[in-house]
Amino acid sequence: MKLFCTQPFWYVKIEPSFFKQEETGMTKAGEREVVKAEHVGGGAGFIMKEALLEAQELGAHCRMFSKVTLPPNCELGHHEHHGETETYYILSGNGMYDDNGKAIPAEAGDVFYCKDGDGHGMKNTGTEDLIFIALILKM
């Protein structure tokens, strides 16, 4: 699969070997473990993290692929990524994304990308759970 950009002279080519080379499987909703973690990155309250795939299923280039739930007034504190990137895809709820100290409103459908060497965080500023997919890729 090749992804081309309108910018000249570059493209991103994702080789099948980027992903796990073994036979793929699946995980069923309700059968995955959900872990509660308090004060992540020094943030207020707690998060609920559901690994959508386990470490042995992620391959060499992916460190985490999880669904994260932030209850109202809870946050995933500011943290930095070194040697990896992290992407958030907001599924539902409202919050405030911390992009290297700059607050950006977050809502369903938004995608946030934290590049290698940068820092970020997320706070639920709404009245319902803020739910997003988090993907960490190793450089």
Predicted regions: what they are:
Residues 3-62, 77:
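A short, N-terminal "cap"/entry segment at the start of jelly-roll beta-barrel domains
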Residues 101-116:
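Short acidic-glycine-tyrosine-enriched beta hairpin
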Residues 72, 83, 102, 118-119, ...:
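A generic "binding-loop/recognition-motif" signal
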Residues 67, 87, 101-105:
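Short, surface-exposed secondary-structure edge patches
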